[in-house]
Swiss-Prot record:
GO molecular function list: pH-gated chloride channel activity
One of the protein's GO biological processes: chloride transport
Glycosylation sites: 155, 162
Protein name: Proton-activated chloride channel
Stretches of the chain found on the membrane's Extracellular side: 86-301
Organism classification: Eukaryota, Metazoa, Chordata, Craniata, Vertebrata
Taxonomy, superkingdom: Eukaryota
Keyword Cell membrane annotated: yes
Catalytic activity, reaction form: chloride(in) = chloride(out)
Function, in words: Chloride channel gated by pH that facilitates the entry of chloride ions into cells upon exposure to extracellular acidic pH. Involved in acidosis-induced cell death by mediating chloride influx and subsequent cell swelling.
Organism of provenance: Rattus norvegicus
Residues bearing the modification Phosphoserine: 9, 14, 24
C-alpha cells in the first residue's frame, strides 16, 4: 500500500516537472517570436516588461515555496519512518525479554492414579476403600473395616535432616474422574501427648512410577523435596478435591503441581463414652474436574511481522529520500531558468 502511494506521488511529480519544462520552453519561444515580429528597432515598454517580470517572479516564488513544503513533508515522513523502525525494534526486544504466560486446559477421561503419601505417626489405619459419587454411612466407626486400596509402607531418611526417619503410608489415588471415583480413609489415634492432633500428607503425580522405581526411598525423598505437604485434623471429615497443573519450564522440562480445595465437616461422635477418648480421622480424596491445566511461557514477538514492517519502513525511507532529492533538483532547475530568463530580459531592455 505504501509502495503504491509513493509510486503514484513520484509519477505525479515527474509529470509536473515535465509540464513546468514545457511551459518554460513555450514561454521562451513566444518571447523570441515577439522580438522577431517587433524587429530590432522596436523596444518594448518598460511598464509591460516590469509587469511580466513581476508575474514571473511571483510564479517562481510560489514554485519555490511549494518545493520547500514538499521537502518538509518528505522529511517529516522520513522522521516518522525512523521512529517506526526504532519503536518496532524496541518492542520486539521487550517481547523477547518478557514472554506471556499461556494457560490451556486438556480434558481427560481418566487420570493416571496419583500417589498419596500419609504420615500417620502413631495413628492406625482402620479402613481404606474406593467409592463412586456417594460414601455410605459408617457401619462401625472407630473399628477396623475393609481395605481394598493398594498401599505400601516405606521408611526413608528425611531429605532435610539426616537424623530423622520418615515412615510413610503410600496409597493409590482415584483414577475414574468421569465416574467421580474417590478414596475414603479412616484412622484412629488412641493416645497423644500433643495438644493438637493432625496427620500430614502429600500428593505426587504417579503411583505407578513409585511402584516401578528401584529406589523407593530416594523417590520419596525427591517427592518430599519437590511437593508441599498438608494436614487434616482429627474429629472432622476432610474432603480433598485435587486438580493437576503441568508447567513447562524454559529448559523444556515439565513440572507437575497439585492444587487442592478442601472442605471440613464436623464428625458427630455417637460412640459410647468409654470409646470417645480415641481420636478419629476421616479423609476423602477426589478429582475436582477432568481438566489438566497446562501453563507455559510463549513469546508473542513474531519475527516475520517485524521483518515485513522494517522492510516497509526502509522502503518509505528510500522513497522519501528519492522524492527529496528530486524536489531539490527541481527547485535548482527552476531557479536556474528564472535567473536565465531574468538575464535575457535585462539584456533585451539594455
Amino acid at each position: 500500500m505504501i509502495r503504491q502511494d509513493l509510486s503514484t506521488s513520484y509519477q505525479e511529480l515527474s509529470e509536473e516537472l515535465e509540464q513546468v519544462v514545457e511551459n518554460s520552453e513555450q514561454a521562451d519561444e513566444r518571447d523570441k517570436e515577439l522580438v522577431q515580429v517587433q524587429g530590432p528597432g522596436v523596444v518594448p515598454g518598460v511598464d509591460n516588461e516590469s509587469a511580466s517580470s513581476s508575474i514571473r517572479f511571483s510564479k517562481a516564488c510560489l514554485k519555490n515555496v511549494f518545493s520547500v513544503l514538499l521537502i518538509l513533508i518528505y522529511l517529516l515522513l522520513m522522521a516518522v519512518a525512523v521512529f517506526l523502525v526504532y519503536q518496532t525494534i524496541t518492542d520486539f526486544r521487550e517481547k523477547l525479554k518478557h514472554p506471556v504466560m499461556s494457560v490451556s486446559y486438556k480434558e481427560v477421561d481418566r487420570y493416571d492414579a496419583p500417589g498419596i503419601a500419609l504420615y500417620p505417626g502413631q495413628a492406625q489405619l482402620l479402613s481404606c476403600k474406593h467409592h463412586y459419587e456417594v460414601i455410605p454411612p459408617l457401619a462401625s466407626p472407630g473399628q477396623p473395616g475393609d481395605r481394598n486400596c493398594t498401599t505400601q509402607r516405606i521408611n526413608y531418611t528425611h531429605p532435610f535432616s539426616n537424623h530423622t526417619m520418615q515412615s510413610a503410608l503410600i496409597v493409590q489415588g482415584p483414577q475414574e474422574v468421569k465416574k467421580r471415583e474417590l478414596v475414603f480413609l479412616q484412622f484412629r489415634l488412641n493416645q497423644s501427648d500433643e495438644d493438637f492432633s493432625a496427620i500430614d500428607y502429600l500428593l505426587f503425580s504417579s503411583f505407578r512410577e513409585f511402584m516401578q522405581s528401584p529406589d523407593k526411598a530416594g523417590f520419596m525423598q525427591a517427592c518430599e523435596s519437590a511437593y508441599s505437604s498438608w494436614k487434616f485434623s482429627g474429629g472432622f471429615r476432610t474432603w480433598v478435591k485435587m486438580s493437576l497443573v503441568k508447567t513447562k519450564e524454559e529448559d523444556g522440562r515439565e513440572a507437575v503441581e497439585f492444587r487442592q480445595e478442601t472442605s471440613v465437616v464436623n464428625y458427630i461422635d455417637q460412640r459410647p463414652a468409654a470409646e470417645k477418648s480415641t481420636q478419629l480421622f476421616f479423609v476423602v480424596f477426589e478429582w475436582k474436574d477432568p481438566f489438566i491445566q497446562k501453563v507455559q511461557d510463549i513469546i508473542t514477538a513474531n519475527p516475520w511481522n517485524t521483518i515485513a514492517l522494517l522492510c516497509g519502513a526502509f522502503l518509505a525511507l528510500f522513497k522519501a529520500a528519492e522524492f527529496a532529492k528530486l524536489s531539490v533538483k527541481w527547485m535548482i532547475k527552476i531557479r536556474k531558468r528564472y535567473l536565465k530568463r531574468r538575464g535575457q530580459a535585462t539584456n533585451h531592455i539594455s
